[in-house]
From Swiss-Prot:
Name the UniProt record assigns to this protein: Malate dehydrogenase
Gene: mdh
The keyword Oxidoreductase is assigned to this record: yes
HAMAP family the record matches: Malate_dehydrog_2
Reactions performed catalytically: (S)-malate + NAD(+) = oxaloacetate + NADH + H(+)
Organism: Kocuria rhizophila (strain ATCC 9341 / DSM 348 / NBRC 103217 / DC2201)
């Protein structure tokens, strides 16, 4: 195969999301069916035996695009030469853990990983954060990698975007492919704002097809609380859908999103739409060749402004908390 393999690092590789993710990467779902990949997989030492089992399965699939797999527990070894880093692993919130405890536990992880990426990753690396709290984990990693441009870091709100697209399509009797120009703003949390003001379904304004009451009373809260509903139903958090969204996010970032549409991605704000500069917040973006651009010139309604501001306020609170902990 003539194309040079891309080195992809994945953290938390033995977890449920990792298990759903790795086979699709090796199959070519993320970087295309012509591009070989080298997988570099990071786990904590106690999870390495399980990860070895996953590697055996990857080998047994005989994927033509899988050039090589290496595993380890040292981010400086795993990230060496990485061109795309998918930071999936994170400390989950456990019973009795306060929000500040969660930020502190993940802060240590993403501080170390940010520094390692800064020191050993490829000079043109792209970093995608899936592990929650994704926005603030991305901020911590980015601030601890001063030699990597901030625009190279992004965090996952594609799962929220996909949930919103699917729900709007179901409500209007349309295909998901018919839904365009939907936006998710703010934090990947219950304060996120899935915005239909500019969305279209088969060319028609979405708000001509659904009621404001449905949007406010059903659509927004259902999308925001979907993760909790899945956790309650299956006894475990979203894994396959989170992996799928990570694939979608990274594919669009590296290969470009669909023409004539945009997607949602948490990126380092440049001050657009009143979101404080430097904050990692979700915006509508277009993507091409590893770069993203925030969609400009959208009219923001009074209702939308209030929802965006509320989510941004939560992000500012998280940033203040990690600043207080000395993580950024």
């Amino acid at each position: 195969m003539s194309l040079t393999p891309v080195t992809v690092a994945v953290t938390g590789a033995a977890g449920q999301i990792g298990y759903s993710l790795l086979f699709r990467i090796a199959h070519g779902d993320m970087l295309g069916r012509q591009r070989p990949v080298r997988l570099r997989l990071l786990e904590i030492p106690s999870a390495l035996p399980a990860l070895e089992g996953t590697v055996m399965e990857l080998q047994d699939c005989a994927f033509p695009l899988l050039a090589d797999v290496e595993i380890g527990s040292d981010p400086r070894e795993v990230f060496d030469g990485a061109q795309l880093a998918l930071l999936v692993g994170a400390r989950p919130r456990t019973k009795g853990m306060e929000r500040g405890d969660l930020l502190e536990a993940n802060g240590a992880i993403f501080t170390e990983q940010g520094r390692a990426l800064n020191d050993v990753a490829d000079h043109d690396v792209r970093v995608v954060v899936t592990g929650n709290p994704a926005n603030t984990n991305a901020l911590i990693a980015q601030r601890n990698a001063p030699d990597i441009p901030a625009s190279r870091f992004s965090a996952l709100t594609r799962l929220d975007h996909n949930r919103a697209v699917a729900m709007l399509a179901a409500q209007t009797g349309a295909s998901v492919d018919d839904v365009k120009h939907l936006s998710v703003w703010g934090n990947h949390s219950a304060t996120q704002y899935p915005d239909l003001d500019h969305a279209r379904v088969a060319g028609r304004p979405a708000l001509d097809l659904v009621s404001r009451e449905w949007v406010q009373d059903t659509f927004i809260p259902t999308v925001a609380k979907r993760g909790a509903a899945i956790l309650e139903a299956r006894g475990a958090s979203s894994a396959a859908s989170a992996a799928n969204a990570t694939i979608d996010h990274a594919r669009d970032l590296m290969l470009g999103n669909h023409r004539g549409d945009w997607t949602s991605m948490s990126v380092v704000s440049d001050g657009s739409y009143g979101v404080p500069e430097g904050l990692v917040s979700s915006f509508p973006v277009t993507t091409s060749g590893g770069d993203w651009s925030i969609v400009q010139g959208l009219d923001i309604s009074e209702f939308s402004r209030a929802r965006i501001d509320a989510s941004v306020a939560e992000l500012e609170s998280e940033r203040a908390a990690v600043q207080e902990l000395g993580l950024i």
